[in-house]
Amino acid sequence: MQKIFNFFPLSVYKSKLSLTENEKKEMIEEVRSMEKKSKNLDYKSASKAWTGDTQGFEYLHNNPKFKNLFIQINNCILEYLDSLSVNHKKLDLYFQRSWATISKKTEHIDNHSHDQSHLSIAFYLRKQ
């Protein structure tokens, strides 16, 4: 069930996705594998979270193991645009970049912006 929160001029769309436990497990294993294959280990300090976009893994949407996730996200985007009365049939929608992050207890992700994107999405595969 989706919800929209309006914080003028920002609208936030929240929804639950229906991924199976096996799908989630497979994606978590894939992210852990990416972490082990990191290409830029000097970038990560003890207080910073691992971010796939800095390690050569910035195109999750092209990874077959994440296919169903991105199909569902795309459907949510269409619902969000419909709720704003935006005719998405007149738009070309595409995923530009997508990556996983791993944040351990004392780690954080620095403040940042996604200025190149019209929409930004966060999905929590596993939250502890």
Question: Which residue stretches match the model-derived regions?
Answer:
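Non-heme Fe(II)/2-oxoglutarate
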Residues: 1-87, 108
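Catalytic core of non-heme Fe(II) oxygenases with the double-stranded beta-helix
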Residues: 86, 94-128
